[in-house]
């Protein structure tokens, strides 16, 4: 008997690729296409998928049973056009995932920020408790073999529920964990009222008798659901829980303690013991592109650093692309490295986001001693140049607001290594930045810390910095 065939358009995306792996695990014949090769497409080939680069009608096998497309794919994509002409069912990634949520006891992790890490730790807690969940998440976990998917034999499906284009309205969960609500995806929602309305509508998808685990510390969440009877609240003000987590958590940042508090409350609701929860939290060392330690950058030009025996800077990679996320990551790194100079390399993601949140972006880099801003990453089909709303304007605005802080525009990311070799030796100079850290004598400074941030192709730059 022939295998069932499924074809994914935009298979290299972090969400779509996880669903492709689900169908591979179910022994379907999986094919897909993407605009360019990437680590994700190469890994999918190793996992058993047939991946074709560029979109064209010939990519689609006429015997395909189902076509699933990424939200980033336009309706006139040649593979979609051919599938419809042949009468092959065509659905979006959220619609496909939505069908899966009906087959499991689904736990949906939502929120403007922190979804991936919270989904990851929730999954590991359930695994630690022996509940063997199936997991679809927007990051990669070492515990899942460096993948964004896990097939379990238990009744639970734990998913990351993205709000973009109202994706989460396709899902039918037994439980919702909501970390926060912020001014994000305004290209779709238009304004903050629209964002809040989207989350409110999502709550209506909760199964009868279901529960919502919500962050009381987030005022939009608190105000939106203050009279909802289905809610279990969590908060950093719950010192008993937050202190337990703070004692065992391995990754820095109050936002992570908050998110893990939500996972703690959720797990307790499902009868998981405190012992298993804390064991999972204590063993979690982070996930892909979430303040991920990547290696070290060798400092060539600093005589002072060589004298002090500090030849290398630590390099982190982070997905932050919204002001709230940038501030949270920089604060967490400052908490982890209180005596280290902190250098941030940031690639803005979408000119529309930069325009709408320009003031907030200007105020996001306060914790960094030096900031390098790269050109905007434009998202195909979702973005256009918006004149004065660009990286150069952001640099000027930051320089005006924080005149003592060193902020630069780096037009060509290929020059990043050279820029770092020039800038890192300036640490220890009284004029470097307003931070008290960089005013220490250089022999009392910790090793410099570099964090490379953004949701675009900046991820491909980080390896070039490593030894």
Locate predicted features.
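Phosphate-binding loop of NTP-binding sites
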Residues: 2-5, 22-28, 45-46, 58-62, ...
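Adenine nucleotide phosphate-binding catalytic loops in nucleotide-utilizing enzymes
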Residues: 3-5, 9, 44, 70, ...
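Active-site beta-alpha connecting loops in nucleotide-dependent enzymes
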Residues: 4-19, 29-35, 287, 323-324, ...
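N-terminal beta-loop-helix "entrance" segment that forms/cooperates
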Residues: 33-49, 145
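Short acidic low-complexity segments
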Residues: 50-62, 412-415, 419
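Short acidic/histidine-rich motifs immediately flanking catalytic phosphotransfer sites
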Residues: 62-66, 446-447
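Short Gly/Ser/Thr- and charged-rich N-terminal loops/segments
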Residues: 303-312, 426-447
């Amino acid at each position: 008997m022939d295998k069932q065939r499924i074809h994914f358009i935009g298979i290299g995306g972090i969400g779509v690729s996880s669903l492709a792996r689900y169908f591979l695990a179910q022994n379907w014949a999986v094919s897909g296409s993407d605009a360019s090769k990437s680590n994700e497409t190469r890994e999918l080939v190793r996992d058993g998928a047939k991946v074709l680069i560029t979109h064209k009608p010939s990519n689609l096998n006429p015997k395909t049973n189902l076509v699933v497309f990424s939200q980033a794919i336009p309706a006139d994509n040649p593979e979609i056009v051919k599938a419809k002409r042949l009468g092959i069912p065509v659905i979006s990634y959220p619609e496909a995932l939505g069908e899966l949520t009906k087959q499991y006891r689904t736990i949906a992790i939502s929120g403007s920020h922190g979804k991936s890490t919270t989904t990851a730790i929730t999954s590991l807690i359930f695994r630690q408790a022996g509940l063997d969940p199936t997991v679809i998440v927007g990051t990669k976990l070492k515990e899942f073999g460096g993948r964004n998917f896990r097939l379990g034999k238990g009744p639970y499906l734990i998913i990351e529920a993205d709000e973009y284009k109202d994706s989460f309205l396709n899902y039918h969960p037994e439980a919702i964990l909501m970390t926060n609500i912020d001014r994000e995806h305004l290209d779709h929602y238009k304004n903050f009222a629209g964002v809040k309305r989207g989350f409110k509508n999502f709550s209506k998808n909760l199964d009868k008798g279901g529960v919502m685990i919500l962050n009381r510390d987030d005022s939009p969440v608190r105000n939106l659901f203050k009279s909802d009877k289905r809610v279990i609240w969590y908060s950093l003000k719950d010192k008993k829980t937050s202190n337990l987590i703070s004692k065992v958590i391995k990754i820095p940042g109050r936002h992570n303690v908050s998110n893990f508090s939500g996972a703690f409350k959720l797990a307790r609701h499902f009868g998981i013991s405190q012992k298993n929860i804390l064991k999972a939290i204590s063993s979690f060392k982070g996930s892909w592109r979430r303040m991920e330690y990547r290696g070290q950058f060798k400092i060539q030009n600093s005589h002072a650093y060589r004298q002090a025996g500090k030849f290398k800077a630590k390099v982190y990679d982070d997905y932050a692309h919204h002001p709230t996320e940038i501030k949270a990551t920089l604060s967490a790194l400052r908490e982890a490295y209180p005596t280290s100079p902190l250098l941030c390399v940031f690639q803005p993601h979408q000119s529309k986001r930069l325009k709408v949140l320009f003031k907030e972006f200007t105020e996001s880099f306060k914790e960094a001693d030096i900031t390098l801003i790269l050109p905007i990453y434009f998202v195909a089909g979702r973005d256009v140049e918006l004149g004065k709303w660009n990286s150069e304007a952001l640099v000027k605005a930051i320089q005006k607001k924080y005149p003592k802080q060193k902020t630069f525009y780096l037009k060509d990311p290929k020059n990043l290594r050279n820029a770092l070799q020039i800038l890192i030796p300036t640490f220890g100079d009284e004029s470097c930045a307003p931070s008290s850290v960089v005013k220490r004598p250089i022999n009392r400074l910790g090793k410099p810390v570099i964090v490379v941030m953004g949701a675009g192709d900046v991820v491909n730059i980080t390896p070039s910095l490593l030894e």
